[in-house]
């Protein structure tokens, strides 16, 4: 999974920094990232959206100039997906196998208008769910911190649009706002490729990049005006709170997983010892398989 994440990130990086063959190198990296784990193509999509936001809000590029520069990213994303599909097709033919129906992987393709609407609703639901806001902003720490992070992204975006006079370039302003709003769609893009996809946490890595967007925006604020001081101070506080909460939460989760692991091993060893004491057990080299569940 980490290799797939790395390759998806590398695809965008190579497309950005290598002028001559960067797009082709990016296609190859993205194709292999999708080959390892399809869902992490969304990492590349969201990174491209972050770069578009940076172009308009921070670099203050004209709309048409940015479009000309960003066509290579579209080529990388489409080309990488096509290359992955070609390699997949060749592999299926070569080994005479078919794709399983798991997670809708065997039903990728164009969906109906109603299915796209359902995919959008599912996307917004899962986006709220992973941020702890399934039923709106709730009175617990994680939900409040994420709500504050989203609010700060919106406020800092407005502040930067005004400070950098991007609002005078209406197309650039609309494009930057649209890119921010499309981040959930980009992070859950697999929803729009098959109606049978069900997201789980491991597939939602791209959602974490919204915190990278907040960091990028905070770096543009200086400790000069009272507005920027308040926004930057609140942003640092929220990010520190999220880091602390997730560190504590992760340690609790891993502690419980470790306890569960040792409990499972202990039960398996106890069952194995009883099996070895049975008269039917003749050979110490017999293979024993322990399957089932316990309460």
Language-model region placement:
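Transmembrane alpha-helical segments
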Residues: 6-15, 28-32, 45-53, 153-158, ...
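Membrane-interface transmembrane helices that cradle and orient dolichyl/undecaprenyl
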Residues: 8-23, 55-61
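Signature aromatic-anchored transmembrane alpha helix within multi-pass, membrane-resident enzymes
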Residues: 23, 220-249
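Central hydrophobic cores of alpha-helical transmembrane segments
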Residues: 24-31, 175-180, 232-240
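Transmembrane catalytic cores of multi-pass membrane glycosyltransferases
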Residues: 31, 35-59, 63-205
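C-terminal transmembrane-bundle signature of multipass membrane proteins
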Residues: 112-119, 182-191, 207-222, 242-254, ...
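Membrane-embedded, lumen/periplasm-facing catalytic core of multi-pass transferases
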Residues: 242-295
